[in-house]
C-alpha cells in the first residue's frame, strides 16, 4: 500500500504524537509499504527528504513559528530570577512551527505520491489540508486522536470558569475530525469513552481503541552501562525516582516535586531524575530549591537514541502525575524496562498500571498519596522485584508489532469497503 501519515507535530519534536507517527511510518516501511509523512518544516522551508534512519519519505511543509510555546526540540531557555522568583519565558526564539496555509504544498506532494490511504494524527492545519485533498480526490481517510482537550487548554492558562465551556467546545472539534474519516482509533478504551461518552447515540464512523505500542526489544530489562551514570551524573546505588516526558503544566509535575520533598524526608538518599524539558521547569526548580533538595534532583533535559533505554534501567520506580494521559508511551517504555510505576487515578493510565500489581495509583493532585506509594516500593525490595516482573509482562501486549498488524488490517478493511461501494 501507499500510505500517507499526516501530523502537525513530528520528529525531532519529542512527545507521544511525534514518537508514534515516526514509529508507525518506520514499521510500515519495514513491512514493505511505501510511506510518506507530511508535517511542518522545522526550518520553515518546504522540502522533501528521506528519514535518515528508516528511509521513508518526509514532506516538510513551509511553516511559521509561534513564539509563545517552545519547539520541543531545542533546550528551553533558562528562566530569569526576579527577587528570588523564577519567571518562565513568555517569548521563545525557537517557537513551535505551524503550517497554516499549506494546501498547495500538500496537493503537490500528494499528486506525486498518489496515496492509497491517508492516516491523520492531529486535528490541526495539516489535517485540514489533507482532508480537503482526500475529499477532492476520493482517497479514504483514517484518523487517530491522541489528546484530551485538557492537554491544550492547560497550556492556555485559562481562568477556571472558562475551562469547562472551552473544553466542551474543543471536544466537539476533536470529534468532528474523527467523523470526517472512515475509521478512527484512539490509544485506550478510556480515551474513547471520554471523547465519545454517549454510547447510545450512534457514531458516524467506527472508533477502535488501539495501543500506540512501543518497540519492546529496545527497552528490554537489563543493567545500565556504567558510563551512563557518569555521563548524566546519576548517583549509583541510591533509590532513583524517574520521570521521562515533557516538563509542561498539563503533566502536573509540581505534584511530583512536592511528593519528592516528602519522600526525601524519610529516604534521605533518594534521588529524583527528570528526563525532558518544558515550560514548567522554573516552577519545579522553585519547589525543590525551597526544600533544599537541588543536589538530589537531576534535570537531564532531552535525551534520545540509545542513552534513553539505559537511563530507564537506572530507575528504582517510575512516577507520572499527569491527569491527562490518553495512554502514555513513556509509561509503556518504563514498564518494558522493568520499572514499578506510580501514576494517578485519572486519564487512561489505569489501563497500564494496575493497583498493587505493577505499581500503585495515587490520588490526583495529592503529593502525600504519591509519596506514600513511592515509599512503599523503594522500601520493599521484594515488592519492587515482583512489580518489576509484572510490568514487563503487562508491557508485552503493547509491542508495536501488534499495533502495526491491526493498523494494516484497518487500512485493508477501509479500502475493501470502498471497493464494495463502487
PLM segments and residue spans:
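Short alpha-helical donor nucleotide-sugar binding micro-motif in glycosyltransferases
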Residues: 110, 178, 302-303, 310-315
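Short hydrophobic beta-strand element within catalytic cores of glycosyltransferases
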Residues: 340-343
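Aromatic "clamp/platform" in nucleotide-sugar-dependent glycosyltransferases that forms part
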Residues: 323
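Conserved acidic donor-binding segment of nucleotide-sugar-dependent glycosyltransferases
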Residues: 355-356, 360-367, 376-382
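A conserved mid-protein helix/loop that constitutes part of the nucleotide-sugar donor-binding site
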Residues: 19, 239-262, 272, 279-285, ...
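Donor nucleotide-sugar binding/catalytic pocket of nucleotide-sugar-dependent glycosyltransferases
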Residues: 39, 59-62, 164-225
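N-terminal subdomain of nucleotide-sugar transferases
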Residues: 1-62, 405-408, 412, 419-422
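Nucleotide-activated donor-binding/catalytic signature segment of Leloir-type glycosyltransferases, i.e.
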Residues: 283-303
Amino acid at each position: 500500500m501507499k500510505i500517507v501519515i499526516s501530523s502537525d507535530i513530528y520528529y525531532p519534536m519529542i512527545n507521544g504524537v511525534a514518537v508514534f507517527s515516526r514509529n508507525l511510518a518506520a514499521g510500515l516501511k519495514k513491512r514493505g509499504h511505501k510511506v510518506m509523512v507530511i508535517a511542518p518544516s522545522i526550518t520553515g522551508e518546504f522540502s522533501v527528504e528521506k528519514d535518515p534512519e528508516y528511509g521513508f519519505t518526509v514532506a516538510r511543509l513551509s511553516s511559521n513559528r509561534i513564539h509563545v510555546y517552545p519547539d520541543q526540540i531545542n533546550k528551553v531557555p533558562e528562566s530569569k530570577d526576579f527577587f528570588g522568583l523564577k519567571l518562565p519565558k513568555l517569548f521563545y526564539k525557537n517557537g513551535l512551527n505551524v503550517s497554516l496555509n499549506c494546501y498547495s504544498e500538500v496537493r503537490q506532494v500528494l499528486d506525486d505520491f498518489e496515496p492509497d490511504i491517508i492516516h491523520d494524527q492531529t486535528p490541526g492545519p495539516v489535517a485540514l489540508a489533507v482532508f480537503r485533498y482526500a475529499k477532492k480526490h476520493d482517497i479514504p481517510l483514517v484518523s487517530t486522536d491522541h489528546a484530551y482537550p485538557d492537554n491544550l487548554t492547560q497550556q492556555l492558562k485559562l481562568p477556571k470558569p472558562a475551562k469547562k465551556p472551552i473544553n466542551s467546545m474543543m471536544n466537539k472539534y476533536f470529534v468532528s475530525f474523527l467523523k470526517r474519516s472512515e475509521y478512527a482509533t484512539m490509544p485506550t478504551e478510556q480515551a474513547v469513552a471520554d471523547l465519545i461518552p454517549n454510547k447510545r447515540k450512534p457514531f458516524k464512523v467506527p472508533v477502535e481503541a488501539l495501543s500506540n505500542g512501543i518497540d519492546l526489544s529496545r527497552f528490554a530489562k537489563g543493567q545500565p552501562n556504567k558510563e551512563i551514570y557518569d555521563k548524566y551524573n546519576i548517583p549509583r546505588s541510591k533509590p532513583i525516582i524517574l520521570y521521562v516526558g515533557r516538563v509542561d503544566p498539563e503533566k502536573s509535575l509540581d505534584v511530583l516535586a512536592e511528593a519528592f520533598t516528602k519522600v526525601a524526608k524519610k529516604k534521605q538518599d533518594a534521588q529524583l531524575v527528570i528526563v525532558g524539558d518544558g515550560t514548567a521547569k522554573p516552577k519545579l526548580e522553585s519547589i525543590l530549591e525551597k526544600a533544599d533538595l537541588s543536589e538530589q534532583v537531576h534535570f537531564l533535559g532531552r535525551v534520545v537514541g540509545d542513552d534513553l533505554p539505559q537511563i530507564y534501567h537506572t530507575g528504582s520506580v517510575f512516577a507520572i502525575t499527569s491527569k491527562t494521559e490518553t495512554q502514555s508511551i513513556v509509561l509503556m517504555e518504563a514498564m518494558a524496562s522493568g520499572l514499578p510505576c506510580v501514576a494517578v487515578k485519572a486519564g487512561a493510565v489505569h489501563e497500564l498500571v494496575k493497583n498493587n500489581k505493577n505499581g500503585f495509583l495515587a490520588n490526583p493532585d495529592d503529593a502525600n498519596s504519591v509519596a506514600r506509594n513511592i515509599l512503599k516500593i523503594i522500601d520493599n525490595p521484594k515488592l519492587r522485584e515482583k512489580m518489576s516482573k509484572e510490568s514487563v509482562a503487562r508491557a508485552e501486549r503493547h509491542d508495536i508489532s501488534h499495533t502495526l498488524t491491526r493498523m494494516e488490517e484497518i487500512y485493508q478493511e477501509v479500502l475493501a469497503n470502498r471497493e464494495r461501494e463502487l
